[in-house]
Regions:
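Generic N-terminal amphipathic, Lys/Arg-enriched alpha-helix
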Residues: 2-20
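Short amphipathic alpha-helical surface micro-motifs
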Residues: 2-4, 28-30, 116-117, 140
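N-terminal glycine-rich anion-binding loops that anchor highly charged ligand groups
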Residues: 3-7, 31-33, 39-49
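Generic signal for short, ordered secondary-structure residues
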Residues: 5-6, 13, 40, 58, ...
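A short alpha-helix capping/helix-coil boundary motif
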Residues: 11-15, 35-38, 53-57, 147-148
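A glycine-/small-polar-enriched, mobile loop at the entrance of the PLP active site in fold-type I
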Residues: 15-24, 43-47
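Alpha-helical packing segments of well-folded alpha/beta enzyme cores
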Residues: 27-30, 34, 168
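Active-site-proximal beta-alpha core segment in soluble small-molecule metabolic enzymes
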Residues: 43-168
Length: 168
């Protein structure tokens, strides 16, 4: 690792506490790495707003990333209004009273089950005919030993398993 003094540009005594401090140069260097991956692979890399929703930095981030991932209405709205670009929305269960706005804001909506897809796809087509729909796949592979944090644990309802997948 490169040793450097992060306080050259920052006087910690001037920051309110608690604070989130972001080194913009480091952020941009990381974004350049992600952009190089996109260019080499043809993949689109999206900002996961669940992990980083500091919209102050969205103008910088959108120079490099194609859009955002949203986990519901509020994140979809934030991505649409503040980031621009693509908005991909996923939720384990969409709420009927929110879905019209989610559909209007999102270019891609991923459903957790075939029943959710069947229920909401007509509304997605009604409110945003150009939006794409998908199904979350449960990979049935775990990297954690703690069941509580394992989306692939037995009887998990997060995504469709291979045994329950239907080709349509």
């Amino acid at each position: 690792p490169v040793e450097r003094n992060i306080y050259k540009k920052l006087d910690p005594s001037r920051c309110p506490s608690p604070s989130f401090v972001v080194d913009e140069d480091d952020l941009e260097n990381n974004l350049k790495i992600l952009d190089s991956v996109q260019k080499r692979t043809g993949a689109k890399i999206l900002l996961a707003q669940k992990g980083f929703a500091m919209f102050y930095f969205y103008p910088l981030i959108r120079k490099y990333l194609k859009g955002v991932c949203a986990s519901g209405l509020n994140e979809a709205r934030l991505g649409y209004e503040e980031f621009g670009g693509e908005v991909h929305t996923y939720s384990p269960a969409f709420r009927e009273e929110e879905f019209e706005e989610i559909a209007r804001l999102s270019g891609h909506v991923v459903f957790n089950s075939f029943s959710q897809l069947e229920k909401f796809l007509p509304l997605l087509r009604k409110y945003n005919s150009s939006a794409e729909a998908g199904i979350r796949i449960n990979p049935e592979h775990s990297e954690t030993e703690t069941a509580l944090y394992d989306p692939c644990r037995p009887l998990s309802r997060l995504g469709v398993t291979a045994a329950n997948f239907r080709e349509e």
